[in-house]
C-alpha cells in the first residue's frame, strides 16, 4: 500500500475544534440508504448524543466537574461528515445517533440548517449565537460541493490562513474564537501542528437572565458537600416561591426547572443521598423531554450555588469511545473535502465555560413521574453534587450539559 504524508484538520467545538492531516490509503465509498426523516427530529438525535457523550465523560472521571455543549460538537462533526466517505462517514453519523437505514442524509443537514437558523434568531430576552469558521491553508483547494454545502447549510465563513506560520495562524483562529464567545474563550489554540492545512471551528455563546432573578441580598456563604470527607464554602443563592419542582422516583432525584427569559430552560437534578450514579444510569432523553413538559408548580425553598466552571476535552479520546475511529487514523476518508491531499483529523478540542449567578447564566449540551407534596414546602438545597442541562425548549435542543461535583473547581 503506497504511503502518503498525512495533513491535519483541526476541529474546535463549543468551542469545538478539529485539525486535519494527510494520510495513506483510499477507502471505498459506501452508499448511505436515503430514506425520509423530518428535520425536526435532529434535536432528538442530539439529545441521545448528549446522553452518550455524558456517559463517556463520566466513565473517564466520575469525580470531576463536567460541562460541554452537545450541539456545538455535533455541528462540527456534521460539517466534517459532508466531506467524509465510506466507513468514516458512517461512523460520524452513527455516533450522532442517526439511524442510517431510516434517515436521508439530506434531511440531517437540512435539520441542522433549520436548527441553527432557529437558534440564531434575534431575541430581546436572551443572547444565543453560534458560528462556524473554516480556516484554509492558502494552497488548499476545497471541493466545490463541500465548500458550497458548509456555507449554505451551516453558514460557515471561510478565512485564508498561512499555516506555514503556525503562530500567526493560531493568532487568527484565536481572535475569531474570542470575538465569537465575547472574550470568554481566549488563547485556546496552542502548539498548532506543522502539518495542519485546515481548521474547522464552531462556537456557541449564551447569555440568559432568569425569569425570576435571585435576590443578591439573600446570597450567603454556605457548605457544599463534595463527598463524605470534603466540604467547601460557596456562595449560595436563595429563592422562595412557586417553582416547577417535583421528585422523580425513577431517577431518585428532585427535579427543578428554572426558566430564562425567552425560550431557554435550565433543568437541575438533585439526586437523593448517594444516588448520583443511579441518576446517571437511569436518566434518559425521553425522561428529560417529559420533565420539560411539566407545568405544575409547588411552593419550595431553592438554594443554588453561584458558580463558574469549564470543561476542556480531547475529542479524539471521547469520540473514539463513541465509535468514531477512522477519521483520526490512516483509515480516514475525507476525500469529499479536497483532492489535493489525503486528510485525517489530527487534533480535536472542545472547551465550554459556564457562569451562573443571581441574574442568570452565561455560557460559551417511561415511567410515571411523582410530584411529592408536603405540608411544609421542601427545601431544594443544591449543596451536594448535582446534574443539569440548559435546553432550548422551542426545539428541545440540549445546548449545554453539566455535572457539578465541586463548584470551587474552575
Swiss-Prot record:
Pfam families listed in its UniProt record: Serpin
Location relative to the cell: Secreted, Extracellular space
Gene Ontology cellular-component terms listed: extracellular space
GO molecular function: serine-type endopeptidase inhibitor activity
Alphabetical list of InterPro entries matching this protein: Serpin_CS, Serpin_dom, Serpin_fam, Serpin_sf, Serpin_sf_1, Serpin_sf_2
SMART domains: SERPIN
Keyword terms of this UniProt record: Glycoprotein, Protease inhibitor, Secreted, Serine protease inhibitor, Signal
Region (RCL), start-end ranges: 360-381
Signal peptide span: 1-24
CDD domains the UniProt entry points to: serpinA1_A1AT
Comment, domains: The reactive center loop (RCL) extends out from the body of the protein and directs binding to the target protease. The protease cleaves the serpin at the reactive site within the RCL, establishing a covalent linkage between the carboxyl group of the serpin reactive site and the serine hydroxyl of the protease. The resulting inactive serpin-protease complex is highly stable.
Protein name listed in UniProt: Serine proteinase inhibitor A3K
Organism: Cavia porcellus
